[in-house]
Amino acid sequence: MSLLEITGLTHSFGENLLYKNAGFTLNKGEHIGIVGQNGTGKSTLIKICTEQIIPDSGRVIRQPNITIGYLDQYAEIDHTLTMKEFLKSAFAKLFEIEIQVMQLYEKAADGDMKNLELAAYYQEQLETHDFYSIDTAIERVANGLGLLAIGLDRPIIEMSGGQRAKVILAKLLLEKPDVLLLDEPTNFLDKNHVAWLAEYLSSLENAF
């Protein structure tokens, strides 16, 4: 099934023609890479896919309701957070469901079966999405990218630019979007971390 498709893409940057009637299709679970010299339009293509740039002509077709994750290493981060707090925000929707579950169980304390059944349904959703293994998932990714040694309780404001870029990458990996768009993800990674990332991505079921 096609998750993302570009057809008839033509786009220029100033007088430099980057794409002429180009296209590609990204299917479910498919892993593709785009290589080229600096200035050939790799980053531009990703921004076209994420609708940050409108192409001169062509169509970008996305499956409805899919999630697309884009690696922006220079995104603004809330500096009041610790690394762990920021990484936990990758699971914000699950934490919202947890609050709903607790509220429903409170309402069901008087024997309301409707609220009890609803709470059980949401509880199952949490278990399906490995909610109770979040800390383990965070430690695995943080360790793979060399962040665990820094300390998960380290405030973001105390981290270097390279460390923050790795934290942004870690959060994106934890979010597990349907489509993962990575623009030079090995920036700031040493050899061991690059090897870990390659192995992690090769085992990923989602498309990137």
Description of each model-found segment:
Residues 1-208:
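ABC ATP-binding cassette signature C-motif
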